[in-house]
């Protein structure tokens, strides 16, 4: 899980979702998991 000011989709499997006010990237590749904060 990377915590970044700017979350971007890294590959075609990355999906940007908003969970309880927090922007997250979920992906099949666990290295691509990100959270905005």
Curated annotation (Swiss-Prot):
Q: Which GO terms describe its molecular function?
A: structural constituent of ribosome
InterPro entries in alphabetical order: Ribosomal_bL36, Ribosomal_bL36_sp
Pfam families from the entry?
A: Ribosomal_L36
Q: Which GO terms describe its biological process?
A: translation
Which keywords are on file for this protein? Ribonucleoprotein, Ribosomal protein
Entry GO CC: cytoplasm; ribonucleoprotein complex; ribosome
Q: Does the keyword Hydrolase apply?
A: no
Q: Which NCBIfam families match?
A: rpmJ_bact
Q: What protein family is recorded?
A: Belongs to the bacterial ribosomal protein bL36 family.
- Identify this protein by name: Large ribosomal subunit protein bL36
What gene name is given for the protein in this entry?
Answer: rpmJ
